[in-house]
């Protein structure tokens, strides 16, 4: 039997994903700010998305952000403004390209030097966002696993 300590979903999801984004920096991490700390509204809002910190499955996310959207947020401490990640349609379906997101789940048992990859989730999309709600009218989309060489 496994000695497992489980962190209930979705409470951990909020802290680990969106809440930590403003604290992370790197070449492959989209620049992110808490909305209440925003000093000036960027002129190039087409390159940003507006996300509520405490949402799930893309609910409340504004893809095509306007200045009025930002000014209309009543609780800016609960929102982030994040650089938009443009997914390229790299998988070829019979009729056109499909965008892909691959999520990796690692487990880190006590005493292990590093985490171990446990499973992955590959999500295919043709919509503005990745997820069922944004792709229900498209084909060759959905979730699966990805195979890789060991």
Residue locations for each model-derived region?
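Domain-scale recognition of functional cores that engage charged ligands
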Residues: 1-150
């Amino acid at each position: 039997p496994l000695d497992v300590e489980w962190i209930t979903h979705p409470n951990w999801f909020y802290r680990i994903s969106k809440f930590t984004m403003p604290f992370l920096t790197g070449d492959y991490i989209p620049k992110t700010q808490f909305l209440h700390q925003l000093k000036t509204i960027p002129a190039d809002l087409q390159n940003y998305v507006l996300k509520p910190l405490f949402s799930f499955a893309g609910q409340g996310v504004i893809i095509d952000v306007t200045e009025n959207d930002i000014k209309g947020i009543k609780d800016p401490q609960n929102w982030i403004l994040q650089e938009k990640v443009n997914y390229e349609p790299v998988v070829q379906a019979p009729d056109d390209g499909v965008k892909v997101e691959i999520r990796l789940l690692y487990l880190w048992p006590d005493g292990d030097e590093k985490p171990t990859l446990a499973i992955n989730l590959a999500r295919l999309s043709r919509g503005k966002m990745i997820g069922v709600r944004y792709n229900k009218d498209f084909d060759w989309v959905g979730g699966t696993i990805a195979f890789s060489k060991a």
